[in-house]
Design a protein with these regions (language model features):
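Short glycine-rich anion-binding loops that position phosphate/pyrophosphate groups of nucleotides
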Residues: 140-143, 209-210, 327-328
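Short glycine-aspartate micro-motif
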Residues: 62-64, 72-76, 132-136, 202-206, ...
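Glycine/GP-enriched mid-protein hinge/lid loop-to-helix segment characteristic of carbohydrate kinases
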Residues: 96-98, 105-110, 160-287, 399
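Glycine-rich phosphate-binding loop and adjoining helix at the ATP-binding site
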Residues: 93-96, 100-201, 332-343
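Detector for glycine-centered tight turns/loop "hinges" at secondary-structure junctions
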Residues: 91-92, 147-149, 219, 227
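Short, acidic Gly/Pro/Ser/Thr-rich loop/turn segments
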Residues: 80-82, 142-144, 212
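ATP-binding/phosphotransfer module of carbohydrate and carboxylate kinases, centering on a glycine-rich
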Residues: 2-98, 106-128, 252-399
């Protein structure tokens, strides 16, 4: 119900009755509870001046999300966009802070650094911690959100951490925590707040140093048996004088990503991915992207990605494929992928699948993940917010 109100501000109680099959009494009770908890608010709908006869009686009342009703916090762990952030109930970013991190090798130290930064950001805003639904963590790792563990990260060199990252963030913030692979976090964010709204089947390709995919089918993430779905970076491509984390020399990770672009431009003094060089990769790639003289090299990397997009489109038949990330959403990269899909694989505007650039940045995805998980789902802790609102009312009565 909250999802409907968020997606359609101004929806009436009668419309909710019809959509969800509620009785008028049930809809009134639910709306009253949400209003009392401060999560939604009522407002007078504007008069429809196109009708010949004016409506007589009480103004029509609509429901909308109270943007200050709840908040969500996020932690994005990346060499490119290391940030902590806060968004309101409509997904609007209201505060963020970059986190300077030069090493990601120790799981607990990394979690402590980011969660402490987030706690300070929350304190700086002055927002009551009781109004936060939770914390979303987006990072390059294989995750099992239901078990709250980071299982493996080739990118950071993490093994099964037995929940240490989750424990550290929860301990330092006191809030519910959801950890998710960055491609999946972006996919969920685009589905609710971005270009994939109202689309039930799509794929999102996140491209930065390496590439990964978040797949959504019937509005649910596809994780695979062991949570390994989406490893497009290991699709076979052209041979390169480089070596992937998996040991091969023909992965898309070496030709369609930032690592491949940096190597081709002579920015690397090594041919095998080195996780201790993550900050260098990020700084160098951002500089390359910012120089228009490199547009053709970036476009070529996008063309290489098309080799992976074609079989993915044929196998999954998504309505939309989103290219995201600092490299993936770059104009030259996107154009290269789009043109190669048309030239070599016959895709056009009449094809069943369309390509689009992502609207949500990785730095936004973490807090939007928390909002999606802990507000617009059955995991909303309504009683906590209802009690918080009641306590505020009691305080006002004695003020």
């Amino acid at each position: 119900m909250l999802s409907r109100i968020q997606a359609q501000p101004g929806v009436s109680r009668a419309e909710l009755n019809r959509s969800f099959g509620f009785s008028e009494m049930a809809a009134t009770r639910i709306a009253r509870d949400l209003l009392a908890a401060g999560i939604v608010e009522e407002f007078d709908l504007p008069e429809d001046n196109t009708k010949k006869t004016r409506r007589i009686g009480r103004p029509r009342i609509g429901l909308r999300i109270n943007p200050k009703g709840v908040y969500a916090a996020g932690i994005t762990v990346s060499a490119y966009y290391s940030e902590v952030s806060i968004c309101d109930a409509n997904g609007k970013m209201i505060a963020c802070k970059k986190v300077n991190n030069t090493s990601f090798e120790d799981v607990v130290q990394t979690a402590r650094l980011y969660s402490n930064a987030l706690r300070k950001l929350i304190q700086k805003t002055g927002i009551d911690i009781a109004r936060f639904v939770g914390v979303g963590v987006a990072l390059s790792a294989k995750t099992t959100p239901g078990q709250n563990r980071n299982v493996r990260s080739e990118y950071f060199g993490w093994l099964n951490d037995q929940g240490q990252f989750w424990d550290e963030v929860q301990k330092n913030t006191g809030l519910p925590v959801e950890i998710e692979n960055i491609a999946n976090a972006l996919a969920l964010s685009e589905m609710r707040f971005g270009v994939a709204r109202d689309i039930s089947d799509f794929a999102l390709v996140h491209v930065a140093t390496f590439a990964g995919v978040g797949v959504v089918s019937e509005n649910r993430l596809v994780r695979g048996t062991a949570g390994d779905a989406g490893r497009i970076g290991h699709f076979r491509s052209v041979e390169r004088p480089l070596r992937c984390t998996c040991g091969r020399t023909d992965c898309l990770n070496l030709s369609a990503t930032g690592f491949g672009v940096l190597a081709k431009l002579g920015k690397l003094d090594h041919d095998t991915f080195d996780r201790t060089q993550l900050p260098f990769y990020a700084k160098s790639l951002l500089a390359v992207i910012g120089d228009k003289a490199n547009a053709e090299h970036i476009r070529e990397a996008g063309e290489h990605l098309a080799v992976g997009l074609d079989p993915m489109a044929k196998l999954l038949a998504p309505k939309l494929i989103i290219l995201s990330g600092y490299l993936g959403a770059n104009d030259a990269y996107f154009e290269g992928a789009l043109q190669e899909m048309a030239a070599s694989f016959g895709y056009d505007q009449n094809s069943g699948v369309q390509l689009a650039q992502g609207a949500v940045s990785p730095s936004e995805a973490a807090s939007l993940l928390a909002l999606h998980t802990f507000c617009y789902s059955d995991r909303l802790d309504f009683e906590r917010f209802n009690q918080s609102a009641a306590n505020d009312d009691e305080g006002s009565a004695y003020a």
